[in-house]
């Protein structure tokens, strides 16, 4: 098959289909014998049945071409989420042997995550592999027999957390040292942690968003500049590992209590904000609310329940940090009033939010959460996504006013006007005009 040239003069109706594009780069190319994509008739993917009644019938996720993975892979995309490119760089620069066999000795979960019925339902969990923490052990024989690489997509561990705000809470008497959750007078915390990489079951994801699987595949293929041709050429493969950030679960108290409906649960679902969470920017309430959420989660654990904080990598409402900083510039140069808060984002990004909270509750169902006694979030989008997935929320806890930095009143008042929960006043559009952030030069 000869190469097909598509120029700017080629009519749109004459653009070749994916299958017409050459599948093997010729020896005249800098890269020899590179297979660009695969087709159902050329492959024998290892069976994978999402939502199967047992792990044996479910099967492992195979998402690499190494060994016999080219013919037998049953997932599109690559492991490690947004870090997959660094893995490729390590291989390309000869720092990593592509045939490296991971030794998972002693890397098994540091605590048992109670198995849930939701793990075996193809609608309850569609954005993560519920068996991702067990795959190297459940499917070791499959890996050997089929000569394919099987990698975990979840890791479960324990740690000690040190935060200045928790030390302050101990010193001021808001938290007590109990030796179990709060370890010492420095406010060090015992915490159980779970890291999760995204794994999408495409039919389920499409259903959550109210689109067809074909529409979803087309958008994912075209809007990523054709990054994953198999989204188009492999309709038989239903699982996709997207190149996006994952999430981390932080559990305070006994992990078994999280799924116990007789125990109270305090929960904060937090979306990443590097500028505030890590570097203390006061233009938003992100770090103050996160620290308040952790403190309240610890208190619930000390009261005999459990506390959970889920941290999603969705920087800048999933618009990214570059877009977020451009919006900051536009806000500060344009007066930075609360009535224009969302409009400035829409002018630059075309949309105010791309976090798509519909997928967020999956990790809650994976943990076995059946109710939330205290929801440490004001977000109507998070609330609605959780409730829509059948998890009731008993009480919603807004951030205390004294924790809101002055420059972030623009953000919080605009969000309350748009539907965020509050026990206080909801400003109208005219009142929002009087809520103004400081300028770059107005720092005292």
Swiss-Prot record:
Zn(2+) binds at residues 273, 284, 286. Its EC number is 3.5.4.-. Keywords: Cytoplasm, GTP-binding, Hydrolase, Metal-binding, Nucleotide-binding, Nucleus, Zinc. GO terms for molecular function: GTP binding; GTP cyclohydrolase II activity; metal ion binding. GTP binds at residues 268-272, 315-317, 377, 382. One of its GO terms (cellular component) is cytoplasm. Involved in uracil catabolism. It is an enzyme of class 3 (hydrolase). One of its GO terms (biological process) is riboflavin biosynthetic process. This is Putative GTP cyclohydrolase URC1. Its main location: cytoplasm. SUPFAM superfamilies: RibA-like. It is found in: Cytoplasm; Nucleus. The active site is at 353 (proton acceptor), 355 (nucleophile). It comes from the Eukaryota.
């Amino acid at each position: 098959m000869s190469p097909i040239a598509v120029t700017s003069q080629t009519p749109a109706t004459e653009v070749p289909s994916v299958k017409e594009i050459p599948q093997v780069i010729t020896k005249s190319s800098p890269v020899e014998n590179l297979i660009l994509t695969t087709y159902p008739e050329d492959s024998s993917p290892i069976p994978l049945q999402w939502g199967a009644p047992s792990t044996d019938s479910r099967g492992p996720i195979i998402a690499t071409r190494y060994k016999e993975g080219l013919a037998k892979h049953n997932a599109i995309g690559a492991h490690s989420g947004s870090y997959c490119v660094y893995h490729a760089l390590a291989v390309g620069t000869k720092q990593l042997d592509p045939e490296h066999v991971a030794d998972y000795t002693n890397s098994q979960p540091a605590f048992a995550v109670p198995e849930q019925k939701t793990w075996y339902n193809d609608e309850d969990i569609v954005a993560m592999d519920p068996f991702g923490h067990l795959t190297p052990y459940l499917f070791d024989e499959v890996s050997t027999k089929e000569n394919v690489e099987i990698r975990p997509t979840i890791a479960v561990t324990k740690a000690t957390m040190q935060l200045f705000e928790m030390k302050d809470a101990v010193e001021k008497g808001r938290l007590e040292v109990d030796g179990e959750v709060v370890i010492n007078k420095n406010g060090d915390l015992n915490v159980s942690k779970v890291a999760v990489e995204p794994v999408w079951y495409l039919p389920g994801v499409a259903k959550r968003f109210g689109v067809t699987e074909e529409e979803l595949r087309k958008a994912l293929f075209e809007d990523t500049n054709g990054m994953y041709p198999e989204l188009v050429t492999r309709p038989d493969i239903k699982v996709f590992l997207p190149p996006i950030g994952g999430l981390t679960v932080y559990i305070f108290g006994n992990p078994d209590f999280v799924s116990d409906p007789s125990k109270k649960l305090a929960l904060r679902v937090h979306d990443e904000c590097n500028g505030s969470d890590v570097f203390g920017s006061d233009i938003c309430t992100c770090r103050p609310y996160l620290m308040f959420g952790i403190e309240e989660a610890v208190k619930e654990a000390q009261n005999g329940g459990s506390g959970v904080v889920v941290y999603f990598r969705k920087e800048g409402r999933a618009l990214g940090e570059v877009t977020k900083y451009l919006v900051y510039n536009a806000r500060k140069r344009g007066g930075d009033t609360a009535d224009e808060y969302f409009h400035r984002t829409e002018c630059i990004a075309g949309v105010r939010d791309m976090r798509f909270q519909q997928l967020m509750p999956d990790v809650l169902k994976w943990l076995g959460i059946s109710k939330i006694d205290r929801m440490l979030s004001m977000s109507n989008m998070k609330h609605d996504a959780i409730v829509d997935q059948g998890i009731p929320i008993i009480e919603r806890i807004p951030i205390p006013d004294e924790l809101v930095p002055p420059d972030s009143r623009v953000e919080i008042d605009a969000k309350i006007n748009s539907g965020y929960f509050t026990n206080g006043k909801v400003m109208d559009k005219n009142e929002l005009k009087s809520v103004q952030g400081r300028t770059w030069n107005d720092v005292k």
